[in-house]
Amino acid sequence: MASSSAPRFRVYSKYLFLTYPECTLEPQYALDSLRTLLNKYEPLYIAAVRELHEDGSPHLHVLVQNKLRASITNPNALNLRMDTSPFSIFHPNIQAAKDCNQVRDYITKEVDSDVNTAEWGTFVAVSTPGRKDRDADMKQIIESSSSREEFLSMVCNRFPFEWSIRLKDFEYTARHLFPDPVATYTPEFPTESLICHETIESWKNEHLYSVSLESYILCTSTPADQAQSDLEWMDDYSRSHRGGISPSTSAGQPEQERLPGQGL
């Protein structure tokens, strides 16, 4: 019994590259058989080429181009049998042909006669876009888009498969390219509401900018009479300075020191 953790076989592509090792089938017979097996995918072109190893044993290469994308989940789906010997089964290695041009050049590189080659249909010269082409397309999208919506729309049109499986990544990129505008801060309380009103102004002058006799005695441990005198002096002093008394600019000249022995 196969392990449940074994990877599931699947080939999903319009273009298939098949290799039948040690295959003695005629290329034309293999081609006709594959046309029947792949009929539902509407084949456009099939090339079957027989190649001989150095020891003389043959193997068969086949390139198939379909109109519809083939979904092959059974590795034995394209097995071929001989009419004369139904027990002779030829099992292929099945791959997606990423570049049909290169595959066709590879399988026909050393064909020595038409007997070893069979072709049907019209070859479609297609190839998968390279990484450089995809990078250039993405760069053009980034530079030309002007909003998140336009960026995501262009990515969806150019890279539909990537867009369907990596939408969150593209949305993150869109937010990075076109961030939300910074909101202007509006204070909850306007500056005008912070101005002291008359009631608060009176309380402020009475409690914050004045010293009661009891507080002064408590802080300085001064007798009541002395504390009262100190507070009256501080009040008078503060009032005189608030009244704008100009500071004195006169200064007494120091007397010259009298040296010993000098008379009057």
From Swiss-Prot:
What's the source species for this entry?
Wheat dwarf virus (isolate Sweden) (WDV)
A single cellular component GO annotation:
host cell cytoplasm
The protein's name in its UniProt record:
Replication-associated protein A
Q: Where is the CRESS-DNA virus Rep endonuclease domain?
A: 10-123
Motif residue range(s): RCR-3: 106-109
Residues noted as binding a divalent metal cation in the record, renumbered to the chain:
E51, H59, H61, E110
User: Could you tell me what the cofactor note in this record states?
Assistant: Divalent metal cations, possibly Mg(2+) or Mn(2+).
Q: Where in the cell is it found?
A: Host nucleus; Host cytoplasm
Q: Which Gene3D superfamilies match?
A: 3.40.1310.20
Motif LXCXE motif, interaction with host RBR1, chain ranges: 194-198
The UniProt record lists the keyword Nucleotide-binding: yes
- Primary localization class, coarse: host cell
Q: Annotated region Oligomerization: where? A: 173-185
Record GO biological process: DNA replication; symbiont-mediated perturbation of host cell cycle G1/S transition checkpoint
Enzyme type, top EC level: hydrolase
Q: Which InterPro entries does UniProt cross-reference here?
A: CRESS_DNA_REP (IPR049912), Gemini_AL1_CLV (IPR001301), Gemini_AL1_REP (IPR001191), Gemini_AL1_REP_central (IPR022692)
Coiled-coil boundaries: none
The record's similarity note reads: Belongs to the geminiviridae Rep protein family.
Q: Where is this motif: RCR-1?
A: 17-20
In the UniProt entry, what is the domain comment? There are 3 rolling circle replication (RCR) motifs. RCR-2 may be involved in metal coordination. RCR-3 is required for phosphodiester bond cleavage for initiation of RCR.
Which cofactors, by name? Mg(2+); Mn(2+)
Q: Where is this region: Disordered?
A: 237-264
- Keywords, sorted A to Z: Activator, Covalent protein-DNA linkage, DNA replication, DNA-binding, Endonuclease, G1/S host cell cycle checkpoint dysregulation by virus, Host cytoplasm, Host nucleus, Host-virus interaction, Hydrolase, Metal-binding, Modulation of host cell cycle by virus, Nuclease, Nucleotide-binding, Nucleotidyltransferase, Repressor, Transferase
EC number(s) stated in the UniProt entry for this protein: 3.1.21.-
